[in-house]
Amino acid sequence: SIGAADGDHLDALYINDTAGTGYTAAITIPQIGTHGTRAGVQGITTIGNANTGTVTFGSGGHQFSGGQVTITSGGDIITPLDANITSDDNIKLDPGTGSLKFSGDFDLVSTGNKTIEIAGNSLAVDSGTSVDTLTIVSGEGSGATNGTITMGGTIGSTELKTVSLTAGTAINLGGNITIGAIADGTVDIDGPAVLTANVTVDADQQNTSIGFTSTINNDGSGTARNLVLDTGAGNISVSGIIGDVGNSGVAIGTIDINNSDGAGTITLAGIGSSSTAGNAGVVDIGNTATADLNLAGTFFTGGATTYQADATGKDIDITANTTIKTTASDITFQTGEIDITDGVTSVTINSGSGDLILVNIHGDGTTDTTDLDIDGTAVTVKDIGLSTAKDEINGVNITGTTVNLDGAIYTGGTGNTIDITGAVTLGGNTIIDSSTSGGNITITGAVTGTRDLDILSGSGLATITGNIGTGGTPLASLDINASNTAGHTGGVTLGGNIGTDSAAGSALTTLGNPKTTGTITLSGVEYNTSDDQAFTAAAFALGGANVTFATSSDPVDFTVSAAGGGDVTLADAANLTINTVAGNITFGGDILGTDNGESTSVTLNTTGTVSVKSIGADGSTADNNINDVTLTGGTVSLNGTISTAVLGGEGETKATDLGDVDINGAVTLAGATTIDTSSSGGTVHFNSTINGGQNLTIKSGAGRVDLAGVVGGTTAIGNLVINAASASHTGAGAIYIDDIGDTDVTAAAGTVNVGNSNTANIDLTGDIYRIGASVFTATSGDNINLTDASGNVEFDLANASLEFAGANIDLSSGTNLVADTGNQALTVLGVRGATDAFDDVTLSTSGTVTVGTGGIGSGTQIGDVTLEGGSIVLKGDITTAGTGEGENQVGDIDFDGAVTIDGAVVLTSDVSGTGNDGKVDFSTTIAGDNTSETGSLATDSLTIETGAGTLTLSGSIGAADGDHLDALYINDTAGADYTANITIPQIGTHGTRAGVQGITTIGNA
């Protein structure tokens, strides 16, 4: 030995340390000092040179102090079984082209803040045990405080089981570490590791574990060093940052941690810093057999990055607030599921301009604290959270140029909003659910994909800003807040379209539910689906200009939720069009405009049923913001007020588009209905039937009104009011009405009040009017027109009054007037017809028939006139004519009832130039009215001219008190035609009162 005994140490030792070709002898050192007790050399020790053959240490142990130990050879440096070399200074072993060969448990220790360097490879050799261990410690406190280890080459062989490198300052790794197929081995790098070359730690033969207790950095050469950590069943743990650039470290090259195989767990504390990547190149961590991949910290990688774990469970564990990111490289979570430990508040995954693919993400508990921030270019997301534990995750923010959703997203914390920004594609049926705590859900971008999308925000607002289902990829279905469940009250906002004008963007589409208290806002212009559209809310706002809804023969429903209201409000100058082909269209609330000076139009079109409440009116109060209204359906159900206004408002901006109402289809009055175009003078047109036991009021101002179908033909309506004086209407618009009722309905309407003294004309184009008490009023002239021209036009009132006021009735050629009011009054101002039409007039009641100052007929207009009444009042003339042959041959005047003459009345059945003189027949008495109408007594005179026609007077004339006439003329015109015999039963009461108190002229020559 050298210096083994106490006090025998050398102060320096040099053995063949001169480099030269002659210094080649092998050197064997049995023992230097006493290991663990005393240093054999207390100073510099230099043994061998680059040409030395081998240096072999004996088994006695070797201890140095006080100076650097340098062992150099051109061949191997060989230590015996379980050798120990210890110093308190630097140690350098340089085997040249050979290796450091050790066996058993080889310990190399420096106890000072010094460096241990092995310049070449380190090779475990078979000493008969086949279990070798390499332990190198440098630094005070057993390497915990300082010290440096530099491994210049590789470590390992098939006999190596364990490698332990410990140093507090740095552990420089210059080559691979390879562990043999020996169970329970370990590779422990205890201290800051520095890669001075590409390093592979290969321990995949058995269950050897790999542990780095501190950082792993690159050296300062400028060349990125690659790192591979490879185990079989053994675990891998890196407790420090890989590429710790945030603390003066240097980024490494590529990283491969059990990417190809290995079932052990992987635990990593981070890669890089928050601002700089910790490596350059590809990063592959884990594989499909990895039992658990544990991540905690920042993982900023510099290349395409893949994370994998066992595909059968939640085996990617995030155990602390964590950021996983790249600047411009893809991040792929390939297999396994991410499991976030309870209490973690923030997880960020950001691939920058690279793509991002995720696996399912879950939480561990119910603390609802984790916020997820997911960003990338093309982002693919699977499940987040769990349907049976929605409170695993707090909030979610996903941002990408494109976002592929292929699963369900559930959140449940106090800030459980879900924000998705980017063009969304549905890769699978997708649920987005924040209903547990009512967080808002916002998709900022378009949504496409032939899958189901179900969004549930509870009491929060659900928003999609972009178009839905465009580009040929319509959704299979769209449900937003459609669950009829307690707490699901949130509104819905769609900022874009569903589909296009030519292609559907979704199949079944359901927005809102009966519990929705919020507003559904639709700001797009096209809502085209291939299935039902169902919208349910307390209010609806359509924000787009010229909004169109379309389906493939499927319904569109705007349904009022339990919160009430349900009005649909259009934006300023935003027209509404709905075309469902054959699907029903239903509005549970009113359709309103926006009061910004520009009226809008409403067009609803289907062969199915259109059901509306008020349009352009909030209840019954007009908003003056709706222009034209066109409702087309197989059936149109009305239940409210339709009110229109001029396009462009009033004043200088007033346009010529007046605000027409056009209703095409069989109308059912589901409630009291008012059509009001009076502020604009727009037209009102019904092209088909009107039924239903409710009142109908039409007020058109100067606009024309057309009821082109039968009113009340199947089910009697309530009261009918059209521009009526009784309702203080003063509009002058013309009115056209087809039949009211038919032969199967006794009364097809209640009271009917049509027109006022300004009404230009009333055209009754049907042939039957079975109605209640009625008044038809038009401006003076022949302006109440009966135009059927195919026979009788019947007014059949069951004990209800009928009045034609303000204007004469004008019969189109071929039209006969037949009216019967039961026991109530029947009043006409006058009746006219076409020249040579010879049409008939029959007015019947057991009450009073009144013919006003317009009289009946002129020239050859009227044929027979029959007036039947409990009393008959004549205020105007009656003129009839006959052709003498055929159906118009006579021209008779028949009075069946007591006649009162009120004014100067002329009855003429002898029209010059006609082929026949009709008869005049009074069935009972004739009396004068004798009442004051203008402050003085009127003159009540009667003139009867029958020519050759028979005159029958069956009762007295002026016999009762006050019944006298003021004049009486009967066939007093001298002429060859005036040949009829005259019989006068009684005039006055002899001896008591005069029947005529004025001129009486009866007969001629």
What are these regions (language model features)?
Residues 1-1005:
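Extracellular lectin-like interaction modules
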